[in-house]
Amino acid sequence: MARIGLGVILNLAKEREPVELARSVAGILEHMFKHSEETCQRLVAAGGLDAVLYWCRRTDPALLRHCALALGNCALHGGQAAQRRMVEKRAAEWLFPLAFSKEDELLRLHACLAVAVLATNKEVEREVERSGTLALVEPLVASLDPGRFARCLVDASDTSQGRGPDDLQRLVPLLDSSRLEAQCIGAFYLCAEAAIKSLQGKTKVGVG
């Protein structure tokens, strides 16, 4: 499915307007970035990442949230090669205004997750640190309550089911990172995920 639809989506991604189309394509890219490492790297090489980074300059809340989630998925699922390309294309800098948003806590946290994951790559850690975005992670996490955040996720149509088992497994290594930012945001997401499952009456979080 991803292989068949890749060309179509990338052609649509070249159409940067109108915002309604951008919102839809960004949402599709958000999910395609976590299809597989190969798909993620092909998307990066063929312009999918460029489109997402371009849309980061927009002001539409739904579009920006898709962008933050897409960048987080790219960092989580694309491997070190994709992470290096993200940093070369200044993804950490583009994440700064998203992580600094005063109006959307979900947007801020998704952006902070993306930059924290990038910082776990030792090859690009210093470059990510210089962007200034990483410094926003700990204060944000300290200001949020996982239970309340879980309810926000459940109320949001695109995150109402929480993260799948594969996503959660990819968050676990953050807990062992030498970066405190990665540790705290990884722990926060896993706590929020447990709260989501509790709200849904499920007993298994999916990490094991």
Describe each model-derived feature in a short phrase.
Residues 18, 36, 60, 104, ...:
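Helix N-cap and loop-to-helix transition residues
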